[in-house]
Amino acid sequence: MVSGHRVGHDALLLAAFAPADRRTAVDLGTGVGSAGLAFLARVPEARATLVEIDPSLAVLAAENAALNSLDGRAQVVTADVATLGRPAGPDVPGKGAADLVLANPPFNADTRHRTSPDEARARAHMADADLLAEWVRAADRCLGAKGVLCLIHRPEALADILAALAKGFGAIEILPVHPRADRPAVRLLVRAVKGRRTPPALLPGLVLAGADGSPTPEAEAVLRDGGALR
């Protein structure tokens, strides 16, 4: 389990959904490094580049790496993910050779969601289909052949996610995350393979809490113990 600054559930779920046979990871929109570092903690043979646009968060990501004794396997890069997929985009270590990309794109683009009053937080929670497509292009540019992209997003964004993945990815697996068994999903975990054309598959959902509000064993295994999702 990774400790440190602001380790959130989304990042831990994302890291748990990544396959353990990956060795060269890029964590896009790393924030304070939670997803990339959680993956490194679970897969000791792996290395990761953590990419974050906000310099203050990038500093916290580096601090978290050191706090968890992962700084020897993690490199923090300050860059705008949306520019990485462009031909003249900035260079990122491992770009074109990574076998795993973790992506936590900004949420809440439309008027159904309130904008955060804090400008930095608002930037991290505002997105639209075009931005999501740019993130997928960035992942495509980072990955080598048959590399795996894992991302987490809102269920409402599923159509945009599938559209963005259609041009370069296949073997798409979708895992819904439910707060309780009788509640609609609040997150989707999506895994896709670069260059594959296998049809999508909907996986059995993950339920975070039982009827009494206590964490399910499956959720505890991931969020408390740093375990893997199927």
List the predicted regions and their residue ranges:
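Conserved SAM-binding loop of SAM-dependent methyltransferases across substrates and taxa
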Residues: 32-45
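Conserved SAM-binding strand-loop segment of SAM-dependent methyltransferases
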Residues: 70-81
